């Protein structure tokens, strides 16, 4: 049975200005800044808020490069491998899709993507003023933010502390909804001498809530409500 692999981007990007006032993208991951060239940035941005297979990375890149009229002699394979080495793209593998998804997400830290609701509100108001959106249409635009119970708990925890997917699963298994801060997280999750940050990913994989939590995190991510980071 062949091993399945899934990929996604990690970090967030900001615009910087050089001495001549020209803007360029910088990816921030684990409080470090990474410079990327246009080809690398194109692959990274197309993998962001997506969970995809290897061949899909190439498909998304080819479409974006053709639309932008961009050409580079370096293959997208080489470029993608460089991003993987730098940790800006991450890969999860396993015998099943669930195993690969768990391997991909379990050690990632969850950062709420702020500003998405404000942006959605702006779009709705603008369309309504232009007469291009009815009340029903506005309601449908906001319907994507109707969270499940698990999604609400995950977002609440992610807003309180720098928390990993595995730590979220542990909190959900214990019914913990409030941790206040990083100290509260330590008290909630690492309550015995056996559980450590090195083995928690293996420890919580067998928890009853694991699959539900993993699916909720993946849904929040692809709907652009979470950003993945590393410590």
Predicted region positions:
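Phox homology (PX) phosphoinositide-binding domain
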Residues: 2-6
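N-terminal ordered "arm"
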Residues: 9-42, 47-49
């Amino acid at each position: 049975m062949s091993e399945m692999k899934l990929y996604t981007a990690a970090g967030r990007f900001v615009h910087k200005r050089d001495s001549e006032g020209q803007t360029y993208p910088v990816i921030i991951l684990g409080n470090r800044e990474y410079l990327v060239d246009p080809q690398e940035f194109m692959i990274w941005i197309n993998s962001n808020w997506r969970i995809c297979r290897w061949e899909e990375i190439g498909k998304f890149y080819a479409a974006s490069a053709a639309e932008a009229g961009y050409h580079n002699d370096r293959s997208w394979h080489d470029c993608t491998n460089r991003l993987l080495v730098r940790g800006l793209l991450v890969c999860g593998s396993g015998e099943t899709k669930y195993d690969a998804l768990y391997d991909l997400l379990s050690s990632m830290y969850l950062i709420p993507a702020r500003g998405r609701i404000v942006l959605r509100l702006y779009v709705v108001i603008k369309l309504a003023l232009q007469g291009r959106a009815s009340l029903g249409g506005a309601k449908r635009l906001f319907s994507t933010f109707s969270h499940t119970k698990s999604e609400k708990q995950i977002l609440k925890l992610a807003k309180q502390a720098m928390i990993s997917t595995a730590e979220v699963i542990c909190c959900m298994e214990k019914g913990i909804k409030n941790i206040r801060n990083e100290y509260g997280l330590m008290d909630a999750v690492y309550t015995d001498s056996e559980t450590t940050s090195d083995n928690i990913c293996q420890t919580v994989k067998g928890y009853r809530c694991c699959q539900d939590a993993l699916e909720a995190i993946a849904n929040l991510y692809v709907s652009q409500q979470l950003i993945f980071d590393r410590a």
